[in-house]
From Swiss-Prot:
Keyword Transmembrane helix: no
Organism for this UniProt entry: Dictyostelium discoideum (Social amoeba)
Cellular localisation: Mitochondrion
PROSITE patterns in the cross-refs: RIBOSOMAL_L34
The family this protein is said to belong to: Belongs to the bacterial ribosomal protein bL34 family.
Record's protein name: Large ribosomal subunit protein bL34m
Classification via PANTHER family: LARGE RIBOSOMAL SUBUNIT PROTEIN BL34M, MITOCHONDRIAL RIBOSOMAL PROTEIN 34 FAMILY MEMBER
GO cellular component, one term: mitochondrial large ribosomal subunit
Keywords, comma-separated and alphabetical: Mitochondrion, Ribonucleoprotein, Ribosomal protein, Transit peptide
Species classification: Eukaryota, Amoebozoa, Evosea, Eumycetozoa, Dictyostelia
Length: 169
């Protein structure tokens, strides 16, 4: 499916700034003859021509049942004008699996500190996962919060039945 889309996009007129488009091909000569044979009608042009402008025909679906030769280009054979492949020729599934380009200069500038170079007075700080706050604790587990729900009132009743002096958190 993707290769047939790429084939059709390479056949469009030279409105894209890529060196990948076949410039020797006349898009008006291409017709879908296999579709015309099965449905007993005249061949359908892929492109419509109005006022010397070429438009893609989206009204009728195109079936391509013939073998299609796709010419693949690498970055070494591209002309100087285009920097990389056109967005129409990039397979998103393949390029999503590749890692992004890493600048080697940034990697060389990273200083790796040996353990022997550290001072004896330095120590590693760990982030505390519990940040205590009296207001938040009372808001979530306090007496008023317990009394606002049915389950909370049940907990208060159980704590009183056990003889607890402190009935909330």
């Amino acid at each position: 499916m993707f290769s047939s889309c790429r084939y059709l996009l390479n056949r469009l007129p030279n409105s894209f700034s890529s060196g990948m488009i076949n410039k020797n091909f006349n898009p008006l000569l291409y017709t879908n003859k296999s579709n015309a044979i099965f449905e007993n009608r005249s061949p359908i042009n892929i492109l419509n021509v109005n006022n010397n402008k070429q438009y893609f025909n989206f009204e009728k679906p195109i079936e391509i049942s013939e073998n299609i030769d796709i010419k693949y280009y690498d970055n070494n054979t591209m002309d100087d004008i285009s920097v990389g492949p056109s967005p129409f020729e990039i397979d998103p599934l393949v390029f999503s699996l590749k890692p992004s380009i890493i600048n080697e200069n940034i990697i060389n500038e990273i200083n790796i500190v040996e353990e022997s170079e550290l001072n004896e007075n330095t120590y590693e700080l760990l982030k505390r996962t519990y940040q205590p706050s009296v207001l938040v604790r009372k808001r979530r587990h306090g007496f008023l919060k317990r009394m606002s729900t049915v389950g909370g009132r049940r907990i208060i009743k159980e704590r009183i039945a056990r003889g607890r002096r402190l009935n909330s958190a």
